[in-house]
C-alpha cells in the first residue's frame, strides 16, 4: 500500500457571516442611581477599553451566580466571599477587567482581586480598612496570567473620573468587558410593578466557552426597584436558569463565569420580597431581559452564522427535557451540519439517543421550524422517518435563524434553549487566541 495516495472529494462550504451590528443598542432606558464607565487601563494592547466600573449612589441588595468549574478564578472566589460576608447587603461597586482572567494564579491572584476591592471601596466610598467590603470583582481573558496591578489600579482611578449615566457611558462599560465579542451587549427597559415604574439594565460579554451552568460569561443586571435581598437571590437564580443556563456555543465551561444582580431602590416604593404580590411580575421582567441578553451572547458566538432555538417537549421530567436540549446544543456534529446547511437529522437523533434522558424512539418526533414560524418540516414522526423535502430543508437552514422542535412523547415537561453553529472561523479564532 505504500506509495499510494487516495483523493477524496471535499465540498468546501462558504457561509456569509450575518450582520451583527443590528443587535447593538442605539439607545436605552437606564436605572436611577447607577453610574458607569469603561476605560483603557493598558492591560489590552493599542488602547482598547478593558476596565468597567459600575457604582450605585445608594447601597444595593445584591446576589451573584458563579461558575461550577473546579478551577474557580480568583475574582469568583473573592466576590463569593464578599457576598457571604455582607449577606448580599451594602454592595455599591462592581469592577470588571478584560484581557486577563486572573484564573489559576494561586494565592497571589486572590490577593490581587482583594486589592481591587479595597481600592474601589476606598476611592469610591471613602472606606478604609476594617469594614465590610462593598465591591464585587470580575475578570475575563487569558487563564494562568497574573493581573498587571499597576495598570488595573490606575484604570480604576481613571474610570472613577469619567463615571456617568448616559447611553454612551453604558455602551463604554459594555465594550470594556469584551474579549472575542464582535459587538457590545446592552439591554435595558422600563417595567411597571403595582403601578410603579422601574428600570433595569443588563450588560454581558461572551462569545466562546459558553455552556449551560455558565461559561466565559460575565454579566450584571442593575435595577432601581426596591428588592429585598432574599428576593434578589431567588429572582437571579430563576432568571439565569431560564436564560444563561439555557445557552451553548461550544460546550466549554470557564473558570470565571459570574452573573450579578444589584437593586438599589432609587425609584422608591415598598420593598418587594418573595411574598409580595409584585414578586412574580418583577421576576418575569428580570427573566425576560436576561433571556434577551443571553440570546445576544449566542448570536455573537465565535464564528457563528446561525442562531438556533431548540424546543424540547413531551419529556418525562424537566431534567430530561434540559438534558436533551443541552446534548443537541453541544453536539459538534449537529452544529457543523447547521453550518453546512445540511439537513442531516440523523445526527440530531443520535444526540437525543445518547443524552441520558428517558427516550422512547417510537414516541419521538423531530421537526425543523422556519424563522417565520410557517409550517414546520417534519423529519421524524413517532419514530418513523418522513419523506423529507431536501430543497425545503436547505431553504430553512439557509437562514441565519431557525428552530428545532423535539417531542419525546413521554410526558408533559418542556424546555427551550438556544445555540449556534460551528464554522471554520470558530477554529481560527480559538487557534489564534493568544497571538
From Swiss-Prot:
GO cellular component: mitochondrial matrix
The name this protein goes by in its record: Arginine biosynthesis bifunctional protein ArgJ, mitochondrial
Location(s) in or outside the cell: Mitochondrion matrix
PTM (free text): The alpha and beta chains are autoproteolytically processed from a single precursor protein within the mitochondrion.
Residues with site note (Cleavage): 215-216
Sorted UniProt keywords: Acyltransferase, Amino-acid biosynthesis, Arginine biosynthesis, Autocatalytic cleavage, Mitochondrion, Multifunctional enzyme, Transferase
NCBIfam families: ArgJ (TIGR00120), PRK05388.1 (NF003802)
Other noteworthy facts: This protein may be expected to contain an N-terminal transit peptide but none has been predicted.
Annotated site (Involved in the stabilization of negative charge on the oxyanion by the formation of the oxyanion hole): 140-141
GO biological process: L-arginine biosynthetic process; ornithine biosynthetic process
Function (record text): Catalyzes two activities which are involved in the cyclic version of arginine biosynthesis: the synthesis of acetylglutamate from glutamate and acetyl-CoA, and of ornithine by transacetylation between acetylornithine and glutamate.
Family matches, as InterPro entries: Arg_biosynth_ArgJ (IPR002813), ArgJ-like_dom_sf (IPR016117), ArgJ_beta_C (IPR042195)
Source species: Schizosaccharomyces japonicus (strain yFS275 / FY16936) (Fission yeast)
Residues at which substrate binds: 179, 205, 216, 302, 430, 435
Gene Ontology terms for molecular function: glutamate N-acetyltransferase activity; L-glutamate N-acetyltransferase activity
Homology family: Belongs to the ArgJ family.
